[in-house]
Amino acid sequence: MKITFRIQYRTVWGESLCVLLSQNHIQHTVEMTTRNGEEWTGKAEFDFHPSEPICYRYAVSRQGTLVRQEFGAIPHSFYPGNLQQQHYLVEDCWRDLPQDAYRYTSAFNNAYTPEQPSRLSDNTGRCITFRELCPGLSSHGQRLGLIGSCAALGSWEYCRPLRMKEVQPNVWHLTLDASSLEYPFEYKFVAIHEETGAVEKWETRPNRIFPLQPLQRGETYLPMETEVFFDDAPQRIAGCAIPVFSLRSEGSCGVGDFGDLKLLADWADETGQKAIQILPINDTTMSGTWTDSYPYNSISIYAFHPMYIDLRQLPALKDKKAAEAFEKARIEVNSLPMMDYEKANKLKMDYLRKVYQMEGKKVLASEDFLHFFRHNEEWLQPYAAFCYLRDSYGTPDFNRWPKYSTYDADEIARLCTPGNKAYTKIAFYYYLQYQLHVQLLAVSTYARAKGILLKGDIPIGISRSSVEAWVEPHYFHLNGQAGAPPDAFSVNGQNWGFPTYNWEVMEKDNYRWWRRRFSKMAEYFTAYRIDHILGFFRIWEIPDHSVHGLLGQFSPSLPLSMDEIRSFGLNLDRDFMTQPFINDKVLEEVFDAQSEYVRQHFITPNGKGGYALLPEFDTQRKVEAYFNGKEDEDSLKLKEGLYSLISNVLFVTDHHDAEKLHPRIAVQNDSVFQQLNWKQQGAFNHLYNHYYYQRHNEFWYQEAMKKLPVLTQSTPMLVCGEDLGMVPECVPWVMRQLQILSLEIQRMPKQMYEDFGHPENYPFLSVCTIGTHDMSTFRGWWEEDPALTERFYHQEMHHQGEIPVHAPGWLCKDIVFHHLKSPSLLCILAWQDWMSINEQLRNPDIEGERINIPAHPRHYWRWRMHLTLEQLLKEKELNQTIRELIEDSNRR
């Protein structure tokens, strides 16, 4: 079989095009030639399997290295047919993403059934194969058809269109006998009823014209793939955001579970919501205490937390007394207003161990489990071994394990061998993950059947005490700490403690680590949120001797030399720039009555009229260690004060090149900045703004474009980015180019110098919400800053008179409707904000509804809904109100 590829693509000197072609996992590269640097031709001759599609992408190379390739989730494709002697003439144009890429994602396609393309008989000599992209038809009981001016195309009779086959999701093919057509002919694509075949919609463009295409016997011509558009209003949907642990049902066990998630899907369906967004559900079990409640610090990027198993779907305990005792304890822990992480997890794990003793061997021998194990063994076995060793040694910190501290695949395989004395305990974790897989997959299938988008959350970081850090340490910089610079959430920045990624190593295998992670998630979810998408451009890297985030620097970055700093008019002594500035005035401002105590115990005169920290207190980690266990008010004040002295510097030294510097983030708020005269302050601010808002834009754009196209197109899920905080100008460039949905929050406007965003102006490719899990609810925010609330009430809501002290239901309803009316593709509101519209049902404890406070690094994540899901499903008035709000905003 021969294939001739033709494409127009303008190259520059030294570049060439090739075709990256595959069938049945067999890869081929076809080099292309050109006479003018614009019209390219490539020829291939292979034996191909007739029933499998040939998929291919175009790529640009320079000196043998690929420098660009098509990155869309939908490659070009065609089916070769039955004749191995056929010659395929393929016309193409370069394509990265379809115009409305979101419509091609699994979030908006729930009804695809693969079809084999139509095939002509073996004695047919000349063929034309149309290949079109058109999303969403199957979900509406339609398929793509072709109708045209000649008799073979129905002579424009609306009841005689030719039916096309959906060979891949949203990809439609039709092969015709070229000799049956009258050239030139006009034609259009139409949406036809699945059963009757009647035309229901015509594409919105002038008639297409097919010119005379002389073909030799044995040739099949494939014109360019095109996108087919119909005059449809964009599908905007509404949804609810809530952590799984926050769900409450009559039968749950002190914490929400996957069975409750199915009930939430029922409520979403009842109210007309088509999206459910949750927080990360990965296993975070480290100490077994409430500190494990933080869902972004998991021990595995694949394994789910055992607390999410719905015990109701498992066998009942055979021991009657044990069953009665469990039920009594379950009712008690489930009646608590907040999650008691320790009680709920201990109760559930005790039950799970008993059930494992009852049915573990049977389940582990089942064909379904063995299938699950074969497909997940790569991560499941190390995870189960990690859990066993964590339990055995009493710590998840593998560096402290007396044995197996360095991962060895062969040793771990021997440890996990059936018959080994540890196997029963290790296999317990296989059993748990299998049950979690079965239950979440059932929820996913259930939600899809109702047309509900299930949106997961991918944390940016991994724990340094995790399976991944143990098994694949080469992918990480374990001596660094990831975090975020100061923002509305935290004036000192955030130090998450996660190691940073070794992107150079990850790039070598085309980011396999990330692609595996996304692929696993796609088994259950149709959309996902990339937590801190800015981390794919650059990450805020904090030295391991720091507690706060103020002494961090972006990585990768372009640090400044001393000559560059001087070029901005800033001629200062390097020690003054990089050493903590401490004098008597600073001490009085920071410590007040404790100043003399600080002079005597923590600092020493530096001979320049100021002070230097003693070596035993010259880093924040040393100070933290000194004050460990001292929780009295004076000690806490001293500790925070010493932290602030240590970060009172104008510049921080680059982690890789000690000769280069970074301006310290937000230093204008600190006393060292006040030591500069007005001219020096102006020069510093000029340098600061250039460094943080201009210098890196192109550099960080290129960094993101190395990673994000590969990752976001590796699965069919809808991609949403959490683009809050200190957002460089290049971030929206990339997100628009890759059609990644942005996050829009009215009280965190993207426009500088504005107090509030304007939902009516949000971009279509965005997720609109009132607040995130890191923020107070709308009712909570309403009471935080009366002056700001007053401006919002008068200027944004256009109300007159005195503002209500507490946000009444009618006002909350207005806010909800205002957000629903936004142009955003998704409007996903926190469950608490949905409930705020009903004064009889909403929680009277406003502050208790907050999920997280980012400024508190040891926050207890424990909020649970105050109503049961069964109650919620019975609240007809509330549910009807929500449905009407959604319908009136033209969401569906």
Give residue spans per PLM region.
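Terminal, intrinsically disordered low-complexity segments enriched in charged/polar
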Residues: 93-99
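Aromatic-rich carbohydrate-binding modules that target alpha-glucans
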Residues: 2, 8-53, 61-82, 133-183, ...
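Catalytic cores of glycan-processing enzymes that make or break glycosidic bonds
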Residues: 103-129, 177-180, 209-892
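Intrinsically disordered, low-complexity regions enriched in Ser/Pro/Gly/Gln/His and often acidic
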Residues: 32-33, 87, 163-165, 195, ...
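C2-type phospholipid-binding modules
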Residues: 80-82, 88-93
